[in-house]
Amino acid sequence: MKVYHDLMRHVLEQGHKKEDRTGTGTLSVFGYQMRFDLSEGFPLLTTKKVHLKSIIHELLWFLQGSTNIAYLKENGVTIWDEWADAEGNLGPVYGYQWRNWPKPDGGHIDQISEVIAAIKRNPDSRRLIVSAWNVADVDKMKLPPCHAFFQFYVADGKLSCQLYQRSADIFLGVPFNIASYALLTMMVAQVCDLKLGDFVHTLGDAHIYLNHLEQVKEQLSREPYPLPVMRINPEVKDIFAFRFEDFTLENYQSHPAIKAPVAV
């Protein structure tokens, strides 16, 4: 994952000191892009252990269209706890926008179903897009979407995906985002009978929180291991039929986890 280490180094060396919503402070750059060839392995960090269980369950939760953390809690995933209200609700966040984007007539658009149908029908379309950034709903969300907009692209029988992430917490959030969208691309490729292309990750405000600087330096001192391999149950052909048990990570060798506080 040299490309991720390059991002951390770039922000440490070139980042601007900025204030932020949480009051923590950041080193920040604007506009940065990483590219991962998904045929070369699953882009899960090896210079610190990453909690893959949380990544998979969160993605399945998004695909359910859920906006309550009950499913996550039932499966031991706590990454959304800080933002949920007393009943576990988050407002119309990712899953709602992906699966139930509201229409003026009172109906809803299932963007995931529609984009998969469009990939199958017209893979050369330039409209293979899913957006979580609904301006009308942003104020109702406990946390507006950080990974806001993604687009699929098909060439030579390979599926690629580009994500635009408006706000990127490089140390804690970005490793999850890379793995999550790489996995989503693999799932969509399988149900559309396509091979794997690239995951392109475009960052808007890419930042390291000031209370993560020592952790970043520790991680940069570590040598990466070879990337692991993600196996997906080949029998699943419906994007909404995937279950946690359908994913198997092989040959994952990593350095120990590095703890850091979450900025809320």
Curated annotation (Swiss-Prot):
Its main location: cytoplasm. Keywords: Cytoplasm, Methyltransferase, Nucleotide biosynthesis, Transferase. One of its GO terms (biological process) is dTTP biosynthetic process. Its EC number is 2.1.1.45. (6R)-5,10-methylene-5,6,7,8-tetrahydrofolate binds at residues 51, 169, 263. It is found in: Cytoplasm. CDD domains: TS_Pyrimidine_HMase. DUMP binds at residues 21, 126-127, 166-169, 177, 207-209. PROSITE patterns: THYMIDYLATE_SYNTHASE. Signal peptide: none annotated. It is an enzyme of class 2 (transferase). The active site is at residue 146. Pathway: Pyrimidine metabolism; dTTP biosynthesis. It catalyses: dUMP + (6R)-5,10-methylene-5,6,7,8-tetrahydrofolate = 7,8-dihydrofolate + dTMP. One of its GO terms (cellular component) is cytosol. One of its GO terms (molecular function) is thymidylate synthase activity. Belongs to the thymidylate synthase family. Bacterial-type ThyA subfamily. Catalyzes the reductive methylation of 2'-deoxyuridine-5'-monophosphate (dUMP) to 2'-deoxythymidine-5'-monophosphate (dTMP) while utilizing 5,10-methylenetetrahydrofolate (mTHF) as the methyl donor and reductant in the reaction, yielding dihydrofolate (DHF) as a by-product. This enzymatic reaction provides an intracellular de novo source of dTMP, an essential precursor for DNA biosynthesis. Homodimer. This is Thymidylate synthase. The gene is thyA1.
